[in-house]
C-alpha cells in the first residue's frame, strides 16, 4: 500500500501549491472514492460541515474514472458549491456501475462481438454524464482541473485544463465531453468525437479522443506540468508563490485505483504464445491495455517520488495505492454488487494499513519504519490543508477580499 509520511511542511502556510491527483481504473474508482470521503470528513472536523475538497486544492487532476471524480468534486452545483461531496462519490458508482458495465453472459457470440466492437456501448454512461454536468464547461469549475485524454487522429495526448480554457476558447470544452472522452478505454467503451467553437473568431476544432490512461493513467506529473506552465508565464489570475523548479512548495496527494503488481499477473512464457486476440482479451481482461496503464501509473509515481526525495520534501508527496488486487477486484468493469462492496472494503483496509513508499531502485513499495497508517497520514494532510486555507483566507481578508468557499490559487490569497 503505497504512501509517504506527511511530516512538517517545507513552507509556511499560505505559500504552497496544493494538488490532488486521481488515477484511472473504471469501477475501481470506488477505492479512491472511499479515501476521499475519509479525507473530506477530517477537513469537516477541522473547518465545519460545509468543507469540500475543492475549497482546499489549487488543482484536482484525474484520468478516466479519476477524471469523472474530478468533475464531481469541482463542477459547480447549487449556490456555487461543488456538485458532489466526497461522501457522494461511492453512491454514484454503486447506483450506476451495473448499468455502465452491464454483466453479460459469456459465450461464442459474445467472444466474437468483443473482437469487432467495444464491450459496452457507453450510452448509459454518456447520458448520465450529460445530465449530471449539463452545459458546464471546463473553465467554469470551482477550482482548477486537469483531465488528460488522447487524440487518435493526431496520435498525441490532449490535456484539458481550467488553466488553458481561460485563455484558449477552443480548449474550453463541455466538461461532459471531456469526461466521456477520458473514460473511453479502448476495447471497453467507444471513442468520442466532438467540436468546440471560438465565438470571437468562428474557428472550429474537432477532437477524436480516447481514454487519457493510455498516456497518463496517473495524472500527477501532467498536473504539475500544467501548474508550472502557469508559473512560468506569471499568470495574474493564478499567481502561485513558487518558482518553476521549486517542487518543495507543492503539497501533493496522489490516489491509485489498485493494481496487481505484487501478485504477478503474467509470465513471459505465457505471453510468448499470444497473438493479437490474446493480447486484447484474456480471461476477461485486456492485457495490452492493462499493461500500458499500469506502466504509466508506476513510472509517474517513481518519477514524482525521486523528485520530492531529491528536494528533501518526501513529506509533501503522499501516494496511496494497493498493489495486491486479484480476481474481479483487478478488473475495470466487474460492476457486480459483491465486487463493488469488495472494492469499498479494499479502500477501507488501505486506510488502516501502514504507510509505505516506493523504493526507487526496485519500483516496489515498502513500509516506512515508524510510520503510522494511511489514515494517520491523511489526518496530517488534512491539518496542512486546513492551515494553508486559513492562512490564505486571513491574507485575503487583510487585503480587502472575502468569501468562504472560493477556489484556491488567487493572488490575493497568497
Curated annotation (Swiss-Prot):
Pfam families: Patatin. This is Patatin-like protein 1. It comes from Oryza sativa subsp. indica (Rice). Keywords: Hydrolase, Lipid degradation, Lipid metabolism, Plant defense. The active site is at residues 64, 211. A motif (DGA/G) lies at residues 211-213. PROSITE patterns: PNPLA. Its EC number is 3.1.1.-. Possesses non-specific lipolytic acyl hydrolase (LAH) activity. Hydrolyzes phospholipids as well as galactolipids. May play a role in disease resistance. InterPro entries: Acyl_Trfase/lysoPLipase, PNPLA_dom. A motif (GXGXXG) lies at residues 24-29. Residues 20-224 form the PNPLA domain. The nitrogen atoms of the two glycine residues in the GGXR motif define the oxyanion hole, and stabilize the oxyanion that forms during the nucleophilic attack by the catalytic serine during substrate cleavage. Belongs to the patatin family. It is an enzyme of class 3 (hydrolase). GO terms for biological process: defense response; lipid catabolic process. SUPFAM superfamilies: FabD/lysophospholipase-like. A motif (GXSXG) lies at residues 62-66. GO terms for molecular function: monoacylglycerol lipase activity; phospholipase activity. CDD domains: Pat17_isozyme_like (cd07214).
Amino acid at each position: 500500500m503505497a504512501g509517504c509520511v506527511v511530516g512538517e511542511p517545507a513552507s509556511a502556510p499560505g505559500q504552497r501549491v496544493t494538488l490532488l491527483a486521481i488515477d484511472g481504473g473504471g469501477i475501481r474508482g470506488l477505492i479512491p472514492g472511499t479515501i476521499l470521503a475519509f479525507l473530506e470528513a477530517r477537513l469537516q472536523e477541522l473547518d465545519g460541515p460545509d468543507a469540500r475538497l475543492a475549497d482546499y486544492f489549487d488543482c484536482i487532476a484525474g484520468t478516466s474514472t479519476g477524471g469523472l471524480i474530478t468533475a464531481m468534486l469541482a463542477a459547480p452545483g447549487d449556490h456555487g458549491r461543488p456538485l458532489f461531496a466526497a461522501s457522494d462519490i461511492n453512491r454514484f458508482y454503486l447506483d450506476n456501475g451495473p448499468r455502465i458495465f452491464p454483466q453479460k453472459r459469456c459465450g461464442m457470440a459474445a467472444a466474437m462481438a468483443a473482437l469487432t466492437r467495444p464491450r459496452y456501448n457507453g450510452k448509459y454512461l454518456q447520458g448520465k454524464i450529460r445530465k449530471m454536468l449539463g452545459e458546464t464547461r471546463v473553465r467554469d469549475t470551482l477550482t482548477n482541473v486537469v483531465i488528460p485524454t488522447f487524440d487518435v487522429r493526431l496520435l498525441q495526448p490532449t490535456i484539458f485544463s481550467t488553466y488553458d480554457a481561460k485563455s484558449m476558447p477552443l480548449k474550453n470544452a463541455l466538461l461532459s465531453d471531456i469526461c466521456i472522452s477520458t473514460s473511453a478505454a479502448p476495447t471497453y467503451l467507444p471513442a468520442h468525437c466532438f467540436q468546440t467553437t471560438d465565438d470571437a473568431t468562428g474557428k472550429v476544432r474537432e477532437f477524436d479522443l480516447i481514454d487519457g490512461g493510455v498516456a497518463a493513467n496517473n495524472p500527477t506529473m501532467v498536473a504539475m506540468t500544467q501548474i508550472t506552465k502557469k508559473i512560468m508565464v506569471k499568470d495574474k489570475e493564478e499567481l502561485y508563490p513558487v518558482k518553476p523548479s521549486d517542487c518543495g512548495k507543492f503539497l501533493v496527494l496522489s490516489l491509485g485505483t489498485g493494481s496487481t503488481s505484487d501478485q504477478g499477473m503474467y509470465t513471459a512464457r505465457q505471453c510468448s504464445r499470444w497473438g493479437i486476440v490474446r493480447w486484447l482479451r484474456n480471461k476477461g481482461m485486456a492485457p495490452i491495455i492493462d499493461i500500458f496503464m499500469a506502466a504509466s501509473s508506476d513510472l509517474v509515481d517513481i518519477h514524482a517520488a525521486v523528485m520530492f526525495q531529491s528536494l528533501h520534501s518526501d513529506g509533501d508527496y503522499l501516494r496511496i495505492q494497493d498493489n495486491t488486487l486479484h480476481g474481479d477486484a483487478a478488473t475495470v468493469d466487474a460492476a457486480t454488487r459483491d465486487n463493488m462492496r469488495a472494492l469499498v472494503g479494499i479502500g477501507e483496509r488501505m486506510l488502516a494499513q501502514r504507510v509505505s513508499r516506493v523504493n526507487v531502485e526496485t519500483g516496489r513499495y515498502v513500509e516506512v519504519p515508524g510510520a503510522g497508517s494511511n489514515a494517520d497520514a491523511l489526518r496530517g494532510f488534512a491539518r496542512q490543508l486546513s492551515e494553508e486555507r486559513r492562512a490564505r483566507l486571513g491574507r485575503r481578508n487583510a487585503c480587502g477580499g472575502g468569501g468562504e468557499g472560493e477556489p484556491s490559487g488567487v493572488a490575493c490569497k497568497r
